[in-house]
């Protein structure tokens, strides 16, 4: 509007964005907060900028208890590892199954190393209890030849039309 009338604008382009007090007082992760995040285009950016500026260190870049220094990962590791307790993390029943490329579960017998009688993978069927082969025969045979039913001696007939 200022350009149309020829007058200069008195608005400050460097002024901070006006945020209503009701929006500033919304509790984080409340239903009202979630509604603001999902419906407004500016509120997620505003909320993240407020969390970065906060004194709680939510997004403080490198500032922590040791005066802003880096955390030594070796201090976070335990003194020793007890490998006897690690067996609880591995499920022996789940080790019998292997996922294929299409996300299906394949039964892998220890003696077969994942292969069936003819060398193909064996898929565990969820419907019945017997494993079946991945490679299934085609439902339909190949398309028959176009001129397969004609006699050998007969040639294609030309249609003669008068001029």
Curated annotation (Swiss-Prot):
What InterPro entries does UniProt report for this protein, alphabetically?
CID1/CID2
* Disulfide bond positions: none
Q: Does the keyword Acetylation apply?
A: no
The annotated region (Disordered) lies at 118-163
Tissues in which the UniProt entry reports expression: Expressed in cauline leaves, stems, rosette leaves, immature siliques and primary inflorescences.
Quick one: where is this thing mainly located? cytoplasm
Q: Where is this motif: PAM2-like?
A: 10-20
Protein localization: Cytoplasm
Q: What induces it?
A: Strongly induced by abiotic stresses such as abscisic acid (ABA), salicylic acid (SA), wounding, high light, cold stress, oxidative stress, hypergravity and dehydration. Accumulates upon root colonization by the plant-growth-promoting rhizobacterium (PGPR) Paenibacillus polymyxa. Slightly reduced levels in response to UV-A illumination, salt stress and heat shock treatment.
Q: Which UniProt keyword terms apply here?
A: Cytoplasm
- Null mutant: what phenotype? Hypersensitive to abscisic acid (ABA) leading to improved tolerance to both drought and freezing, as well as impaired seed germination in the presence of ABA.
Would you indicate the residue range of the signal peptide? none
Q: How does it assemble?
A: Interacts with PAB2, PAB4 and PAB8. Interacts with MPC.
Q: What PANTHER family does its record include?
A: OS05G0344200 PROTEIN, PROTEIN EARLY RESPONSIVE TO DEHYDRATION 15
Q: What does the entry's domain section say?
A: Contains a PAM2-like motif, which seems to be involved in the binding to the PABC/CTC domain of PAB proteins.
Entry function: Central component of stress responses that interacts with poly(A)-binding proteins. Negative regulator of abscisic acid (ABA) responses, including resistance to drought and freezing as well as stomatal closure regulation. Mediates resistance to the bacterial necrotroph pathogen Erwinia carotovora subsp. carotovora and promotes the induction of marker genes for systemic acquired resistance (SAR).
Q: Under which name does UniProt file this protein? A: Protein EARLY RESPONSIVE TO DEHYDRATION 15
Native organism is Arabidopsis thaliana (Mouse-ear cress)
* Gene name in the database record: ERD15
């Amino acid at each position: 509007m200022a350009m149309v009338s020829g007058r200069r604008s008195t608005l400050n382009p460097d002024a901070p964005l006006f945020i209503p007090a009701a929006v500033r007082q919304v509790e984080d992760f409340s239903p009202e907060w979630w509604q603001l995040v999902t419906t407004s285009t500016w509120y997620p950016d505003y909320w993240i900028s407020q969390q970065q500026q906060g004194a709680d260190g939510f997004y403080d870049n490198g500032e922590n208890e040791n005066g802003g220094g880096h955390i030594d990962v070796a201090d976070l590791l335990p003194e020793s590892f007890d490998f006897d307790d690690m067996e609880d993390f591995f499920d022996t029943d789940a080790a019998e199954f292997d996922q294929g490329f299409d996300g299906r579960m394949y039964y892998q017998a220890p003696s077969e190393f994942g292969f069936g009688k003819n060398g193909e993978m064996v898929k565990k069927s969820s419907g019945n209890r017997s494993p079946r082969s991945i490679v299934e025969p085609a439902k339909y045979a190949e398309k028959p030849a176009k001129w397969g039913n004609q006699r050998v001696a007969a040639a294609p007939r030309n249609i003669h039309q008068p001029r």
